[in-house]
């Protein structure tokens, strides 16, 4: 159950980051103003996902050592890189992919230890 909560915290955090990206996509040229920004569905989705992710994360910390749990959030870097590359068409250079591979190795090692 704890691993499922950890995965949920990761996914909610990633969804929050993706929603933030969508929220600011239209703000590249000029900021629309606070009231217009607050009407963004994407911004509210980001706040909801990040808030819920925080609550789930607190439950994870009750049940798992922080030295194991926190590095597992490294999966967020992997997921966000994939979304950036394939959804937002952002370039990812070979060094970045190497870093992602190293993160995956580290998460795998810690997962075996837990």
UniProtKB/Swiss-Prot annotation:
Annotated keywords: Cell inner membrane, Cell membrane, Lipid A biosynthesis, Lipid biosynthesis, Lipid metabolism, Lipopolysaccharide biosynthesis, Membrane, Transmembrane, Transmembrane helix, Transport
Residues spanning the membrane: 41-61, 64-84, 91-111
Predominant place of localization: membrane
InterPro entries the record matches: EamA_dom, Flippase_ArnE, Small_drug/metabolite_transptr
Pathway: Bacterial outer membrane biogenesis; lipopolysaccharide biosynthesis
A GO molecular function held by the record: carbohydrate derivative transmembrane transporter activity
Record carries keyword Iron: no
Protein's UniProt keywords contain Zinc-finger: no
Membrane topology term: Multi-pass membrane protein
An annotated GO cellular component: plasma membrane
Biological role: Translocates 4-amino-4-deoxy-L-arabinose-phosphoundecaprenol (alpha-L-Ara4N-phosphoundecaprenol) from the cytoplasmic to the periplasmic side of the inner membrane.
Similarity comment: family membership: Belongs to the ArnE family.
NCBIfam families: PRK15051.1
Known partners and oligomeric status: Heterodimer of ArnE and ArnF.
Protein name in UniProt: Probable 4-amino-4-deoxy-L-arabinose-phosphoundecaprenol flippase subunit ArnE
Origin organism lineage: Bacteria, Pseudomonadati, Pseudomonadota, Gammaproteobacteria, Pseudomonadales
């Amino acid at each position: 159950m704890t691993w499922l909560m950890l995965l949920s915290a990761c996914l909610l955090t990633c969804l929050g980051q993706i929603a933030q990206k969508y929220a600011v996509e239209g703000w590249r040229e000029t900021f629309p103003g606070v009231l217009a920004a607050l009407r963004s569905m994407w911004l509210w989705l980001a706040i909801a996902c990040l808030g819920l992710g925080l609550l789930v994360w607190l439950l994870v910390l009750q049940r798992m050592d922080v030295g194991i749990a926190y590095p597992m959030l490294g999966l967020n870097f992997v997921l966000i890189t994939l979304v950036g590359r394939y959804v937002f068409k952002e370039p990812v250079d070979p060094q970045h992919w190497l870093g992602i591979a190293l993160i995956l190795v580290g998460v795998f090692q810690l997962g075996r230890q837990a």
